[in-house]
């Protein structure tokens, strides 16, 4: 079997996965690609993991200690932060795998990491669609917003549970088929389709579900909702409308910049699954593109807290309170007593006052 057949065919080692490390098959040597990924991918994943954890933990801390989730957007933001945290926690395992060019962990951890990786990636994308619709209701349907959002808020947790359930269902092939096995004297954690009669069909099904729910669904929601939001803001006589429009445009552009390359590579891979006859140079270009595109896609974990939470004035205020309290805790070790009690007291009073005057249906996100 030549390199193209192995790369896009029905070989046990399924390199159609966008996060795979391309092995060296036949006359087409991808050693230079592996040398690139050994350095680039671990560094990129480590940075995404660190900054993604910091930003999303701040969001969770804000809801846990300073601000109750009172609106639909709050519930979505909290779930998205949890999703991103779980997602970035899988990246160190893949960083080690790329650096060592082998899977050094157990078979159970292989299934768990691949499954967690897929579930949280898809869940995060679906939550972006939910946030888009919530903003559409709040801004475009402003006259009906209070009634609609109040009624729907009761079911917001149910909506999030449904999103998690759908994400688990569409990611189930990842849990089922991924396993640890030996290939060319090294252990890999990849899908293996020996147990099914139509392996290419299962590959295409998995990629199709990811493309539909992980890209096209949130894209359609965002395009529809944000076009009407921009139209409404342009017509509004509001001094802050220009800033709001810039925020909307930034959200859409960041989503497109992060997700289009990754999903185009996935689409090309799906179209060419089972085909033969591609040149070695084409394989190398696709391998490079796949690794760079996935890093771009994963940047959303770092950018989501900024674009969807801390861009709002209220969240920035809570962020400053967190910083003050962290500073206070450090000072407490040196100067125990009134200083920390004073800061915590002011924070507590401020929180109570804010929650008293704030409408129960108000969102912590303000554009």
Swiss-Prot record:
GO cellular component, one term: external side of plasma membrane
Membrane topology annotation: Multi-pass membrane protein
UniProt-annotated glycosylation sites, renumbered to this chain: 2, 35
Stretches that traverse the bilayer: 40-66, 76-96, 112-133, 152-172, 204-230, 247-271, 296-313
Residue intervals annotated with topology Cytoplasmic: 67-75, 134-151, 231-246, 314-367
Purpose of the protein: Receptor for the C-C type chemokine CCL20. Binds to CCL20 and subsequently transduces a signal by increasing the intracellular calcium ion levels. Although CCL20 is its major ligand it can also act as a receptor for non-chemokine ligands such as beta-defensins. Binds to defensin DEFB1 leading to increase in intracellular calcium ions and cAMP levels. Its binding to DEFB1 is essential for the function of DEFB1 in regulating sperm motility and bactericidal activity. Binds to defensins DEFB4 and DEFB4A/B and mediates their chemotactic effects.
Name under which the protein is recorded: C-C chemokine receptor type 6
Source species: Mus musculus (Mouse)
Gene (name only): Ccr6
